[in-house]
């Protein structure tokens, strides 16, 4: 992937996302991950993480308002399946009843991510968007 993708919640209410629980889950899912937390409220992103192993490389961040996950880079051996799994995993951090979407940097491709979306459904969407 050469451009960023986003998983975002469409809510006007403040978002509660337990950063400690999220960081713990990141460390469990991706052992050895590098997590950088920023405490400056003027920064656009409060958290960023990088992970690199031979089978998977990813770079992501969380907006300071905790309403947008940014996927700056993602590549893996099983890219389509792994990317769909990662997007669904990020979606689970937002309340299931809220409208959450996935889009590209240019907001050209927007795909709703209902909480009960299957990985196979997301893979089918991604297949239409990315060349394998």
Identify the role of each PLM range.
Residues 1-31:
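Short, extreme N-terminal segment that most often corresponds to the first beta-strand
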Residues 1-3, 34-39, 63-69:
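Generic detector of short, locally flexible boundary/turn motifs and exposed helical patches
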Residues 6, 45, 111-113:
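Generic detection of short hydrophobic beta-strand segments and adjacent strand-loop junctions
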Residues 9, 15, 33-36, 53, ...:
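Weak global preference for isoleucine
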Residues 24-34, 91-98:
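A common structural junction motif
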Residues 30-59:
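Structured domain cores in non-transmembrane regions
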Residues 50-132:
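Charged interaction segments
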């Amino acid at each position: 992937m050469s451009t960023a993708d986003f998983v975002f919640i469409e809510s006007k209410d403040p978002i509660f996302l337990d950063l400690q629980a999220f960081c713990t889950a990141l460390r469990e899912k991706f052992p050895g991950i590098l997590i950088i937390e920023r405490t400056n409220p003027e920064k656009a992103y409060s958290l960023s993480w990088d992970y690199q192993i031979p089978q998977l490389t990813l770079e992501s961040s969380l907006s300071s308002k905790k309403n947008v996950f940014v996927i700056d880079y993602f590549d893996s051996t099983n890219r389509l399946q792994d990317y769909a799994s990662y997007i669904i995993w990020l979606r689970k951090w937002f309340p299931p009843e809220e409208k959450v979407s996935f889009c590209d940097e240019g907001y050209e491709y927007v795909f709703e991510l209902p909480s009960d979306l299957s990985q196979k459904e997301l893979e089918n969407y991604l297949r239409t968007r990315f060349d394998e």
